Amino acid sequence: MTQGKIIKVSGPLVIASGMQEANIQDICRVGKLGLIGEIIEMRRDQASIQVYEETSGLGPGEPVVTTGEPLSVELGPGLISQMFDGIQRPLDRFKLATHNDFLVRGVEVPSLDRDIKWHFDSTISIGQKVSTGDILGTVKETEVVNHKIMVPYGISGEVVSIASGDFTIDEVVYEIKKLDGSFYKGTLMQKWPVRKARPVSKRLIPEEPLITGQRVIDTFFPVTKGGAAAVPGPFGAGKTVVQHQVAKFANVDIVIYVGCGERGNEMTDVLNEFPELIDPNTGQSIMQRTVLIANTSNMPVAAREASIYTGITMAEYFRDMGYSVAIMADSTSRWAEALREMSGRLEEMPGDEGYPAYLGSRIAEYYERAGRSQALGLPEREGTITAIGAVSPPGGDISEPVTQNTLRIVKVFWGLDAPLAQRRHFPAINWLTSYSLYKDSVGTYIDDKEKTDWNSKITRAMNYLQRESSLEEIVRLVGIDSLSENERLTMEIAKQIREDYLQQNAFDSVDTFTSFAKQEAMLSNILTFADQANHALELGSYFTEIIEGTVAVRDRMARSKYVSEDRLDEIKIISNEITHQIQLILETGGL
């Protein structure tokens, strides 16, 4: 423990002297109030400290004391359904402790509740040899999450005592005789430094798709479990709603939602909506699998930088249990702005647009902690972390450094488009500029598992949208009447794909989520109509005949999105009606 003195305060940056014994990344208590800070630079005996609380009122001469520990999070039962700030202070218990609606400075509240007793069921016996990552037992944390208690990193040996029963997280539950003869007394909780990635046995290639229930994503731009996706877009294009939708309905075991520097109202929406929503995969409340980290725009800037690492460390902990985890960061741009502010105050050489030169490596450090991997220890298990980051480029300009550095790393780009949002087409993901590098592997996975020709269907649907885009310019110049019958039909089919399939209402109880089976049925109907209508044109029918003769069946296709999942057969039989209607047109008109 080292004690120094403040010599300079510059916003969230404090410089202290007499710190020659300290180390970079040590946590400090700054000033008489004991504010939480982290050493980010050492020069001789002077330490530059990033303070995670409001620094107004601090002055030269006040003491700075190091703890000798890096910024760490507590990992154990009690994480799920909780809301923390960027440095893992529990906001609900913080309010009870301080009797204040705002974050009172210098107050320390344990991250995990020390009073709750959790029922621990041991799965191993005394005398058994264990090593890092081995599962010792489970705690039923919520109806849907079985919290697995693992041997902490660096510990191996023989279990000399373990018992099932009710324990708080700081009571000794098991004892291990280590290889050097010493004894390790273990609790239900462990600590881990947030800036250090948790080790795994081996990395695996992501294959299984993350089903989000959002048609434009699952069909054209899928992300795998263990993949990384970016959602850039201008203000009002719907980044937060896309993030919320994925957080609500993704087929994962755990969701970690990091509100990093965005509006407080958005976190309020999450708190209001999530408890009422039912997870379609488990039938339980969505909050029973969710951890929230709130570091809104009115909280100290420095804590934004920590919040992303806090979230990904929690995600790695659940991944090591063998769970699939999705982490949403809204928004990584605000996190990058926090880096820029600290870099400026440290007087570092600026890079593009004032961001630090190491921006790209910091973004890469975050996204590379996502992935599919085999965990350490026994029994053997696989876990995944899917990282989805919103990016808020000023003015929607995706050529700015944060977006460009993000796109170099992630394999999925859901580009939100202001013109689409202005036309009230939501989700406003532009199908011509977005991409997914997992598309082929996901298509092959689905074709093998579901025994469908999904890959060819989405290729055909995208072809219609691309052809529509090239025809739109002609239509704008000389009108739709100048197009051939085939081209007019192409425009009509593309319109159906856009309006009846890609457009989705996040606030409609049925349309908000679409299962893969329903997506396939809806897209198959549109492509069946395309095949039958093109066939009728070849046999001599006119475009107007086809359109007027299929009004009723096309109306049913348009309403398919509002048909509930338990009435899927009503959607599947539409293809028979399409064939019947086109047959009637051929019998009464054409050649």
Curated annotation (Swiss-Prot):
Protein EC: 7.1.2.2
Q: Cross-referenced CDD domains, in alphabetical order?
A: ATP-synt_V_A-type_alpha_C (cd18111), ATP-synt_V_A-type_alpha_N (cd18119), V_A-ATPase_A (cd01134)
Q: Which GO terms describe its biological process?
A: proton motive force-driven plasma membrane ATP synthesis
Looking at the record's lineage, which domain of life comes first? Bacteria
Q: What reaction(s) does this enzyme catalyze?
A: ATP + H2O + 4 H(+)(in) = ADP + phosphate + 5 H(+)(out)
- Transmembrane annotation, as ranges: none
Annotated residues that bind ATP are located at: G233, P234, F235, G236, A237, G238, K239, T240
The answer, when asked if Nucleotide-binding is one of the entry's keywords, is yes
This molecule's function is given as:
Produces ATP from ADP in the presence of a proton gradient across the membrane. The V-type alpha chain is a catalytic subunit.
The protein depicted here goes by the name V-type ATP synthase alpha chain
This protein's encoding gene: atpA
